[in-house]
Amino acid sequence: MSNVNDLVGLEFEPYCFEIEKGKIREFVQAIGDDNPIYFDMEAAKKEGFQGIPIPLTFLQVIDLWGGYSFQEKMEKLKLNPVKILHGEQHFEYLEDIYAGDVLTVSSKVINVDIKKGSSGGMDLITTENQYKNQHGDLVAISRNVTVHRH
Amino acid sequence: MYYEEINVGDSFPTLQKDEITRVQLVKYAGASGDFNPLHTVEEVGEQAGTGIIAHGMLIMGMAAQGVTTWIPRKNVKKFQVRFKKMTKPGESIEITGKVLEKKENNIIVGEVLAMNSEGEVKLAGIFEGVLPSKND
């Protein structure tokens, strides 16, 4: 692309995702996380939750199943999929998020850094997502740094 | 677990994960929706020059399991990682952590590392939790 800095401010179409218990269970099984709060209501209540909570990294599921696919996102950012790596991931949890919640996500590119190194340059593209629940409360914020090798 | 019981420099118990298999990468792809073929399709791994590599977010998920083994999920407010090295199927990941800082308002800041059995660091992260106080 002509200038990767032009990506700053690029907004993605908002997307919506209803969190299902079964999806949470499938996700923790894939990771091998056997914490019972993710599938047993009694265990969740014992920890002070009012329902089955999402695991810390589950917000990725909301992005990828509710929003753009990996390929679509690469096309929108005009990046070569075999040249990219996940550089950093930040999550901030503001309110509890439960199975049964419907989250709406707004997502945009907030920063681009261009770095030059001895083995070639790279672009660092930061996307910020804001997650609101069905009551309109902002419940989480995530930031993702994608590394695009030149 | 109370804020007063935690000290800067305290290490958390190591979480040892099972060896990563290709089937696990297929499961994680389906569960997460990350269908980047680099994680599951041999030819794409060869084209990228890396071979098949594990999802970084799978390793972050393991690190998150470590964090929520050490302090309750309910108390975790922030979690961020930097991905350092690629992980391949066949590697076994262990998660270690320690307390870096205690802040006002019952906040603790911890470090979390995911490394393979040779000690190669795959990701380095920071988490923040708010713990109950004995004085509350």
Which stretches of residues belong to each language-model region?
Chain B
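Mid-chain, well-packed structural core segment of small domains
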Residues: 67-95
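Generic detection of short hydrophobic beta-strand segments and adjacent strand-loop junctions
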Residues: 14-20, 81, 127-129
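HotDog/MaoC-like acyl-thioester-processing domains
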Residues: 1-13, 86-136
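Hot-dog-fold acyl-thioester-processing enzymes
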Residues: 1-75, 136
